[in-house]
Amino acid sequence: MKQKPDLSFWKLWNLSFGFFGVQIAYALQSANISRIFRTLGADPHDLSYFWILPPLMGMIVQPIVGTLSDKTWCRLGRRIPYLFVGAFVAVAVMCLLPNAGSLGLAISQVMIFGLIMLMLLDTSINMAMQPFKMMVGDMVNEKQKAKAYSIQSFLCNAGSVVGFLFPYVFAAVGLANVAAPGIVPPTVVWSFYIGAAILIICVLYTTLKVKEWPPKEYEEYNGKANLSENVEETKKSEKSDWITLLRNAPATFWKVGLVQFFCWAALLYMWTYVVDAVAETVWDTRDSSSEAYQIAGNWTGVLYAIQAMGSVFWATMLPRFKNTKMAYAVSLVLGGIGFALIPFVPSQFGQIVPFLLIGCAWAAMLAMPFTFVTNALQGYGHMGTYLGLFNCTICLPQIIAAICGGFILHLVGGHSATMMIVAGVLLVCGAACVGFIHDKK
């Protein structure tokens, strides 16, 4: 195989620039889905069930996009057609979902419509997100991959901060933050509109600026094993061997998976209940149609942005730990403390501290698990398949947590703020399980 050429900074930037828009859409979804469904009239005890869809669609869509795009070649390229289609569907759904309460439907019909829109939004965001990772793998040499993923990480965090802040900024400039009962306020509706516009602009930019290698050139740099005529055979071989691979997986694979279970269950409860938790704790309200609740929703977006910025800072601290396991465990404990503090901090600005601590856990969750697993898998082969299977340790815990969320909320008296303590306990349990991991250097 030929050595892939070095790419200029701007070529690396163009490969991932569309990710900025996709991440804005993802941040708007993460921060506002519970708020939207509560405003539409969903019972808090049913709220977690809506959150089954995001991880479920991630498990289904990402492998399909990967497999199909391996076998695709057209005028737009190999990966970009899926990015393009996913982005356009996401834009359409982002314009429809926040208007679900304005269509004159009965509440049951509104919920069904909202669920269909959420499923399409999850599907399209996953469809638009996956090609960026693949294009780096396709076109960037080993020497530059760290730089390429650093650019992608920067755009990811920048997009998250922008998406989280939109409702707060629109309220600050005078857009109405309350609406009639069952209607999503203009601050949220326009956040989705502007997010959709930025998404399509960013994706169009990447589409126009990036030229993927045609099949012959792709073969020269990536080998025949990746070409479309061999994909079906490879796919069948991998499918038949998944059970064997899991049986032979190193113990670290399963031990890190156990830590992942507690971590991602905790994060699912944050995404589901934190708007209600902040509204209860700081503004003393559970009424989703009240002005106070909508202010809490906007402020939660600010807190998410602060968490993202805290995560970036803590990521620079992690390499300073001499012991990787210690860094992982300490980060999760700090995050657990952050979650547990949320119900006990009645100050709007005081809530910044818990979210900074949660950012520490988030930074470790993004970096540490794959470090341990890839170290342990050295010499095993099938690295790509193992990492694909390891993705289930992110999705399955969220699905299980979502199924159990309503029952646990009932056990804690229906107080969403108390669910933050549950999330904190889960993170501390995850930190305790870090001790079982044996890091292979």
What are these regions (language model features)?
Residues 325-369:
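C-terminal transmembrane helical hairpin of 12-TM major facilitator-type secondary transporters
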Residues 43-53, 186, 284-308, 418:
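Loop-to-transmembrane helix entry
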Residues 127-140, 364-379:
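Intracellular juxtamembrane helix-capping segments at the cytosolic ends
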Residues 1-9, 101, 105-116, 127-128, ...:
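Intracellular loop-helix junctions on the cytosolic face of multi-pass helical membrane proteins
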Residues 83-108, 334-346:
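C-terminal ends and interior cores of transmembrane alpha-helices
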Residues 93-128, 350-366:
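Hydrophobic core of transmembrane alpha-helices in multi-pass small-molecule transporters
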Residues 2-57, 255, 259, 263-287:
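Helix-loop boundary and gating motifs at the non-cytosolic
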Residues 44-45, 142-154, 379-390:
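Loop-to-transmembrane helix entry/capping segments in MFS-fold secondary transporters
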